[in-house]
């Protein structure tokens, strides 16, 4: 089944960057800020259009739009709006960098960003990360992770995965399924290196075939095998790859659910997914969320510990309930 991503944010038409720039300036000028105007303009435009508005704003007012937004806004609402103003790949690089900065590493964020990307998407992230932070992503990651988890992420980041233009090969899928079976359920202990190699090298369409063949061969799903054979971060990373191969929308729907159903709300994850998927497949994620959890994502965000302009910005990005 081919994945059909549907976004919630698209190009606005008609589009007048100069008028938008003036509306934004008026919303931030003088005493107080008109947050609703900011939401209406920036959520209602695509990222490319926001970059045009930013350029026009600077040309017309000799001011930096993002700096003005940072001065006027605060807290989680600012995080959403500033996130929307960043080119998508830069935004993900910033999130990766933040996940590895300071004490401890947010492995779940690394998994969410790195294990869900095609090789083509990964190449862009690697290039922008190094340009922005003057350090290769693989090197930074190696210093923050360890063991087979580090090995898997390193393989993914170094771009060994076959591109989407590589034809799927049923014969090879049978062979890869047999290798996974021999490396896991068919033996005492687990040969993680075999799992790492196949999970990081094969394209997503090829892996879909491998997982089907695995079920035929072993009578078990690949998820069951991973649950038995892996633990901790490696388990999470493998499961993320499997979920994204089968349905990226289901993977992100589950991540959003967990972000809102723990002790308190994981705002960073909530913001990152809603902002970064809004122009890719957020509409599809909404449909999957409702299918899996029997409630709308819109209502879940409204009921989560979100409030004020922050809540309004998130629900605006989600589009119609």
From Swiss-Prot:
Record text about domains: A pair of annexin repeats may form one binding site for calcium and phospholipid.
Instruction: Enumerate the transmembrane spans.
Output: none
Provide the residue intervals of the Annexin repeats.
Answer: 15-86, 87-158, 171-243, 247-319
The protein's UniProt keywords, in alphabetical order, are: Annexin, Calcium, Calcium/phospholipid-binding, Repeat
Sequence similarity: Belongs to the annexin family.
A GO cellular component annotation in the UniProt record: cytoplasm
**Record Gene3D superfamilies:** Annexin
Q: Which domain of life is it from?
A: Eukaryota
- Protein's UniProt keywords contain Metal-binding: no
Q: Signal peptide position in this chain?
A: none
- Is Repeat tagged as a keyword? yes
Q: Which GO terms describe its molecular function?
A: calcium ion binding; calcium-dependent phospholipid binding; phosphatidylserine binding
Q: Which gene encodes it?
A: AnxB10
What protein is this chain from? Annexin B10
